[in-house]
């Protein structure tokens, strides 16, 4: 789904992604986007921030109440504050206008690939990683804390699995980005910081003093020890 009020951009994105094999459903304002989202089933949402009737941030908050669908925000705003807001509300990635269609396509494919890995069932013996109050069920793609399910986005799930599967390893931000986003790292620390903060808000008792994922200042992150 593409939610974009600029018809020229919408047509350009549609033309390019259709050639790449994607089917596109268009919405030209936030309210139409919500209506279409509730009526259909989609692999990803491309979402502009500045929309009529309902802006992109409010759109994102509404769909995040019930869905973990990958969301890639596209906007003319390129400030760190706007990027942090979008990611903070639950976007998986962010790209600023004007953007390269090659880069946009790569980000779309990467987001869908992460979501597919998140939802795929593996024909293996059920593997559950237990860390203090967390039970991370790899095959059923679920996380429980004290027996209660946690709702993670695909990116948050990939981050948690990365640390849980490598309990002794210290990860630099470059290593995290390459592992989770499967792309070259261009020193965009903000995107990792925001996703890490959102994950901690869900798994930690006190996100300001994290125990599950520790920060090693100037180095990176590692799984906490209990």
Curated annotation (Swiss-Prot):
Keywords associated with the record: Cytoplasm, DNA-binding, Phosphoprotein, Transcription, Transcription regulation, Two-component regulatory system
SMART domains: REC, Trans_reg_C
Pfam families in alphabetical order: Response_reg (PF00072), Trans_reg_C (PF00486)
Matching SUPFAM superfamilies: C-terminal effector domain of the bipartite response regulators, CheY-like
GO CC field: cytosol; protein-DNA complex
Chief location: cytoplasm
Residue runs in coiled coils: none
4-aspartylphosphate PTM sites in chain numbering: 48
Post-translational modification: Phosphorylated by YcbM.
GO biological process entries: regulation of DNA-templated transcription
DNA-binding region: 126-225
Protein location: Cytoplasm
Alphabetized Gene3D superfamilies for the sequence: 3.40.50.2300, 6.10.250.690, Winged helix-like DNA-binding domain superfamily/Winged helix DNA-binding domain
Function as written in the Swiss-Prot or TrEMBL entry: Member of the two-component regulatory system YcbM/YcbL.
Name of this protein: Uncharacterized transcriptional regulatory protein YcbL
Organism: Bacillus subtilis (strain 168)
């Amino acid at each position: 789904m593409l939610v974009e009020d600029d018809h020229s951009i919408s047509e350009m994105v549609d033309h390019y992604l259709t050639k790449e094999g994607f089917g596109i459903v268009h919405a030209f304002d936030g309210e139409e986007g919500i209506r279409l989202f509730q009526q259909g089933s989609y692999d990803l949402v491309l979402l502009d921030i500045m929309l009529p009737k309902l802006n992109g941030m409010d759109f994102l908050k509404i769909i995040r109440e019930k869905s973990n669908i990958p969301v890639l925000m596209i906007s003319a705003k390129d400030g760190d504050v706007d990027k942090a807001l979008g990611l903070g509300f639950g976007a998986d990635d962010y790209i600023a206008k004007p953007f390269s269609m090659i880069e946009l396509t790569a980000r779309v494919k990467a987001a869908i690939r992460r979501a597919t890995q998140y939802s795929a069932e593996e024909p293996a013996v059920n593997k559950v990683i237990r860390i203090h109050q967390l039970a991370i069920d790899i095959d059923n793609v679920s996380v429980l804390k004290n027996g209660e399910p946690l709702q993670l986005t695909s990116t948050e799930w990939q981050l948690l699995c990365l640390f849980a599967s490598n309990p002794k390893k210290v990860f630099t931000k470059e290593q995290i980005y390459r592992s989770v986003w499967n792309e070259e790292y261009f020193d965009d620390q903000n995107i990792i910081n925001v996703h890490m903060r959102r994950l901690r808000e869900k798994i930690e008792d006190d996100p300001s003093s994290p125990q599950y994922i520790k920060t090693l200042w100037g180095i990176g992150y590692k799984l906490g020890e209990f």
